[in-house]
């Protein structure tokens, strides 16, 4: 009949069974009665604990039918499937660019808003994305965790390493439209363009 006689007094959501209401109430109380025996992390719902346990067991019960890659959670599989379908349901209202995932759209929107909520505690420079701040911080710590397997040179970030690897491979993907000279890195092309 679709009747939901058990109503949450906090938010008004209705449930068909009393036990479902009791389970729902943990959202409001903050109670986490289901604990992981491996790491102690608490969960409001039993199903969330069951899903979490696959991290420790290494079990990946949700395989992709296209490429065979396994996932611990169904939601991750659903998200992954967009790679194969090409589905991009999230559209930027400013420029029309489409995204497969909502978090990618939200990150992109910062280009239009100019929002840079992540600031460096060392020099005060602001960044739109946390991963850019993390990468930037390596300048101050002088940390260079990315190593070239060809020559052993170390780099602060993956982008710099990948740019460097083009030198070993002889790749020069950045070409000057004025004279045809090619460069391994875009920064070299930008410097070169100043002579024209």
From Swiss-Prot:
Primary localization class, coarse: nucleus
Protein name: Gastrula zinc finger protein XlCGF8.2DB
Residue ranges covered by zinc fingers (C2H2-type): 6-28, 34-56, 62-84, 90-112, 118-140, 146-168, 174-196
Presence of the UniProt keyword Metal-binding in the record: yes
Function: May be involved in transcriptional regulation.
Pfam families linked: zf-C2H2 (PF00096)
Entry keyword set: DNA-binding, Metal-binding, Nucleus, Repeat, Transcription, Transcription regulation, Zinc, Zinc-finger
InterPro entries reported for this sequence: Znf_C2H2_sf, Znf_C2H2_type
UniProt subcellular location: Nucleus
Any one GO molecular function term: RNA polymerase II cis-regulatory region sequence-specific DNA binding
Organism of this sequence: Xenopus laevis
GO cellular-component term (any): nucleus
UniProt superkingdom: Eukaryota
Sequence similarity: Belongs to the krueppel C2H2-type zinc-finger protein family.
């Amino acid at each position: 009949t679709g009747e939901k006689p058990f109503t949450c007094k906090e938010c008004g959501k209705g449930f068909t069974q009393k036990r479902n209401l009791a389970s729902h109430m943990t959202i409001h109380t903050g109670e986490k009665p289901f604990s992981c025996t491996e790491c102690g992390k608490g969960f409001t719902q039993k199903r969330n604990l069951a899903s979490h346990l696959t991290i420790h067991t290494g079990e990946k019960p949700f395989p992709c039918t296209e490429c065979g890659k396994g996932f611990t959670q169904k939601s991750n599989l659903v998200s992954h499937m967009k790679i194969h379908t090409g589905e991009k349901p999230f559209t930027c209202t400013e420029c029309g660019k489409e995204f497969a995932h909502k978090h990618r759209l939200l990150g992109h929107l910062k280009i239009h808003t100019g929002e840079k909520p992540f600031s460096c505690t060392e020099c005060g420079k602001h960044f739109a994305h946390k991963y850019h701040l993390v990468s930037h911080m390596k300048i101050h710590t002088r940390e260079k965790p990315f190593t070239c397997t060809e020559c052993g040179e170390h780099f602060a970030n993956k982008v710099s390493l990948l740019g460097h690897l083009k030198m070993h491979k002889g790749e020069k993907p950045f070409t000057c439209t004025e004279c045809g000279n090619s460069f391994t890195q875009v920064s070299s092309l930008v410097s070169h363009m100043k002579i024209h």
